Design a protein with these regions (language model features):
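Central helical "cap/lid" subdomain
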Residues: 1-42, 53-58, 170-174
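A structural signal for well-ordered alpha-helical scaffolds and beta->alpha junctions
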Residues: 1-2, 20, 90-98, 157
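Flavin-binding catalytic cores
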Residues: 56, 69-121
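A generic structural signal for beta-strand entry/edge sites
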Residues: 56-60, 144-146
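Short, solvent-exposed aromatic-acidic interface loops
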Residues: 64-68
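C-terminal catalytic lobe of FAD-dependent flavoproteins
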Residues: 99, 103-183
Length: 183
């Protein structure tokens, strides 16, 4: 729950991390029959992605330009992302998303909008202009044995182990012994 990372720091009277938060929308759609068994991600230009959402028997639909609804940075001043999201007037950008995406895949014109999921997405400010999501790892942040860990991509679960392994000591456990815990 990265959007709450600065909440912990603020409540602990520690300096905030330089994080950017965005209110994001994932549209839930029903695909036309011809596309039902496909996941699609266009990686060039104003890209979009369609992925299965099995719990609702639908697909998520996101678009790099229209998924973000608004953003803020709380390096110097704290903003509670969950409160902002709760009070945010949720108006879907689905129509903009689909109008752009159907230029690439005309069958998407027949996708049916069902609902949207809104959430707070958090990234490091230094990656605001690209899609990089390197691991944020601050060992002994302000006090000994207090660390922050944030990874923005699924494969970060493996990278964080390497990052921790590279430190001489973490949580008082020698590097070699700590790594064996995961073997």
């Amino acid at each position: 729950t990265y959007s709450g990372l600065n909440t912990v720091l603020r409540n602990s009277n520690m300096p905030l991390l330089n994080l950017k938060h965005e209110i994001t929308e994932m549209s839930l759609i029903e695909l036309p029959d011809e596309l039902k068994n496909f996941s699609i991600t266009i990686m060039d230009g104003p890209f979009f992605s369609i992925m299965p959402f099995p719990s609702r028997k639908l697909n998520t639909f996101s678009h790099v330009r229209y998924t973000p609804h608004g953003s803020w940075i709380d390096k110097d001043e704290y903003h509670n992302g969950y409160e902002i999201l709760k009070d945010y007037e949720k108006k879907s950008n689905f129509r903009y998303m689909i109008n752009d995406a159907k230029r690439y895949i005309p069958l998407l014109e027949y996708a049916v909008y069902k609902d949207s999921i809104y959430e707070v997405k958090t990234v490091q400010v230094k990656n605001e202009t690209d899609d990089g999501r390197p691991i944020l790892f601050t060992k002994d942040y302000e006090i000994k044995n207090f660390s922050n860990i944030m990874g923005g991509k699924i494969d970060n679960i493996y990278e964080i182990l390497d990052t921790i392994k590279e430190t001489k000591e973490f949580l008082g456990v020698k590097k070699r012994h700590f790594w064996n815990i995961f073997s």
